[in-house]
């Protein structure tokens, strides 16, 4: 069976969409974001399509597109709907990899009763945890790692995003007992070519396919 990976984060806006674009492009994968909250600046799927270089048919349609950039449970309430977690089943396996991106951080509520991490636990797919490198990331990252391990979710490792703070990265991986997958540096301008080159330089693709 082809590689199927979940990408989540220690927090919102840590850079997991940019990382997902890089990973999906490098794997020549399909990409799926089951829940999109907020659409004023375009969807994450459109951003991944632009940055990954993947053809349009590789960007799979969202199950829910919510109008408000907020926690999915609240954004759905504003739109007058409730997210049914039974709708959040990964697409059938194909002969190519699949990258699934969550919304916000691991512990973001989908509805009044379920967190995203609960859905990930049900799927039992390997998870890549994205973390920022700035002040506060040690606490956020270790709490996230503990939550993933407590639910027996297979953890591929942690991908850092941001400037180089080697000591923070080292101590997170040592205490958390997780693999350091690499660090995606800030890119300006952020272009598909620059992202592809940075990913190839910073990560070992075999770490995601083993």
UniProtKB/Swiss-Prot annotation:
According to its UniProt record, which reaction does this protein catalyse? (7R,8S)-7,8-diammoniononanoate + CO2 + ATP = (4R,5S)-dethiobiotin + ADP + phosphate + 3 H(+)
Q: Name one GO molecular function term.
A: dethiobiotin synthase activity
Q: Which residues bind ATP?
A: 13-18, 101-104, 185-187
Does the record's keyword annotation contain Lipid metabolism? Answer: no
**Oligomeric state and partners?**
Homodimer.
Entry's family note:
Belongs to the dethiobiotin synthetase family.
Report what the protein is called.
Answer: ATP-dependent dethiobiotin synthetase BioD
Origin species: Afipia carboxidovorans (strain ATCC 49405 / DSM 1227 / KCTC 32145 / OM5)
């Amino acid at each position: 069976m082809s590689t199927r990976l979940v990408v989540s984060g220690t927090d919102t806006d840590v850079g997991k969409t940019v990382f997902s674009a890089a990973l999906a492009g490098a794997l020549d994968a399909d990409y799926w974001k089951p829940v999109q909250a907020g659409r004023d600046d375009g969807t994450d799927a459109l951003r991944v399509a632009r940055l990954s270089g993947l053809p349009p048919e590789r960007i799979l349609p969202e199950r829910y597109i919510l109008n408000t950039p907020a926690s999915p449970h609240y954004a759905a309430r504003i739109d007058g709907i409730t997210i049914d977690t039974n709708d959040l089943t990964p697409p059938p396996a194909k002969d190519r990899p699949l990258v699934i991106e969550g919304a916000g951080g691991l512990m973001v509520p989908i509805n009044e009763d379920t967190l995203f991490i609960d859905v990930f636990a049900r799927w039992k797919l390997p998870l890549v945890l994205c973390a920022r490198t700035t002040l506060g990331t040690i606490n956020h990252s270790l709490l996230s790692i503990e939550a993933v391990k407590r639910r027996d979710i297979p953890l591929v490792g942690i991908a850092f995003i941001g400037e180089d703070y080697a000591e923070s990265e080292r101590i997170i991986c040592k205490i958390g007992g997780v693999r350091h997958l690499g660090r995606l540096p800030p890119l300006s301008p952020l272009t598909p070519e620059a992202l592809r080159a940075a990913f190839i330089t910073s990560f070992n693709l075999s770490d995601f396919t083993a």
